[in-house]
Regions:
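Glycine-rich FAD cofactor-binding loop and adjacent beta-loop-alpha segment at the N-terminus
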Residues: 3-4, 8-72
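Short gly/ser/thr-rich secondary-structure transition/capping motifs
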Residues: 123-129, 186, 245-254
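Active-site flanking residues adjacent to catalytic metal/cofactor-binding acidic residues
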Residues: 6, 29, 144, 268-269, ...
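Conserved N-terminal helical subregion
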Residues: 52-55, 62, 66-154, 160-170
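Conserved FAD-binding catalytic core of PHBH/FMO-like flavoproteins
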Residues: 54, 144-246
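FAD/FMN-dependent oxidoreductases across multiple families
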Residues: 218-302
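C-terminal helical "tail/cap" subdomain of flavin- and related membrane-associated enzymes
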Residues: 294-370
Length: 370
């Protein structure tokens, strides 16, 4: 089967590998150079669902060397002054042997590993443009060109979209008073923020807050920004040095009504974009890839490939919709400071702190989706 993939970011490139291993001939269209693809300052939380996908494709053993595992995921509600912790014991038994609740990955390391893997696959042909000269040459076309997809605009695919009244600020910071194997997801009235380990004393701080306050904080000097971080980090954790200048980006939500259009299949952020809280974004995108490659391995569908886009769209709808609603609800939960919500929030934290069964269930949803 001849497949075209538009976009060779993390999702498009992984799709190319996955479909090539399923026996397809893949043309991978990308206007950016490999250097431009690699040089992005982003950090991701990798769950066991992504680990399983990477293992299946034979990428995990090489890639895992550059990942930072964490054994503790601390969830804190500042408004309640309550906390509970996800541990490796809360994972399904087969996943516990990896001794990690999850892993933190820097974009450049994942991208380099995946691009290196692609270079060794003969049935992937990289083409340095984002325009397909003749779409009739392909049985199916995968659009993985991101949330601002030109493909989606050209096909006029409808979607549900809104902008959060927030922006995200991220910075690499040296911290004191924190273990190198723990991560934090913190809920407060400004918006959720995360503290992710990058090895040793280096951490990535990712905070979402109102556009007005975020714009003000982005204009602070490094010393004043450190002072600001000291006011929002958990008690006992102190910022020492900012490694890179803080960066910011807007936060929006987008969900296609359908994940296909004719023989075009929408993958990753071309189909859905969610709030970064909980670190679900990349894992959700890679589960798209896994679902699609599983369909290509079904003999009946190989001979009826025109059915694949519709079946893919239906197959992914529950997981994507559920995670989208869950992350959006978590943002709204975090920012609600109305007294009527105090008791429900208190009960949620009390139950999660004391019920290992519920923690296992929630962590499984965060790890493997729906």
């Amino acid at each position: 089967m001849n497949i075209a993939i538009i976009g060779s970011g993390l999702t498009g490139s992984l799709a190319a590998i996955s479909l090539a291993k399923a026996g397809c001939r893949v043309d991978l269209y990308e206007r950016l150079s490999d250097e431009e693809l690699v040089n992005r300052d982003r950090t991701y939380a990798i769950t066991h669902s992504s680990r399983k996908i990477l293992e299946k494709l034979g990428i995990w053993s090489n890639l895992s060397k550059d990942l930072v595992p964490f054994q503790y995921l601390n969830v804190i509600d500042y408004e309640l002054n309550k906390k509970f912790v996800f541990l490796t014991n809360d994972l399904p038994i087969p996943d516990q042997k990896y001794s990690a609740v999850g892993w933190i990955a820097e974009h450049k390391f994942i991208m380099l590993s995946i691009l290196s893997f692609i270079s060794n696959l003969e049935n992937i042909n990289k083409i340095p443009t984002s325009v397909i000269p003749n779409t009739n040459n392909y049985d199916l076309i995968v659009a993985a060109d991101g949330s601002s997809s030109n493909t989606k605009k050209k096909l006029k695919t409808p979607s549900f979209h809104f902008k959060y009244d927030q922006m995200c600020i991220t910075a690499k910071v040296l911290l004191r008073g924190v273990k190198s194997n723990e991560a934090f997801e913190i809920l407060n009235s400004e918006g959720p923020f995360a503290v992710l380990p990058l090895g040793g004393d280096l951490f990535q701080v990712i905070c979402s807050q109102s556009i007005l306050k975020g714009t003000y904080n982005m204009n602070l000097s490094k010393s004043l920004f450190l002072d600001y971080l000291s006011t929002i980090l958990p008690y006992g954790i102190e910022p020492d040095t900012i490694i890179d200048a803080p960066e910011s980006f807007p936060i929006d939500f987008c969900l296609n009504y359908l994940f296909f259009s004719g023989k075009y299949i929408y993958l990753g952020e071309t189909a859905h974009k969610i709030h970064p809280v909980g670190g679900q974004g990349l894992n959700l995108c890679w589960r798209d890839v896994d679902c699609l490659s599983n369909l290509f391995s079904i003999p009946l569908l190989k001979n009826n490939h025109s059915l694949i886009p519709l079946i893919y769209s239906i197959s992914r709808s529950i997981d994507v919709l559920s995670i989208s609603i869950l992350t959006d609800s978590l943002v709204r939960y975090s920012r609600s400071n109305i007294s009527i919500f105090y008791l429900p929030r208190f009960l949620v934290f009390f139950i999660l702190k004391n019920s290992s069964l519920l923690r296992k269930y929630i962590l499984n949803l965060m790890t493997n989706g729906f």
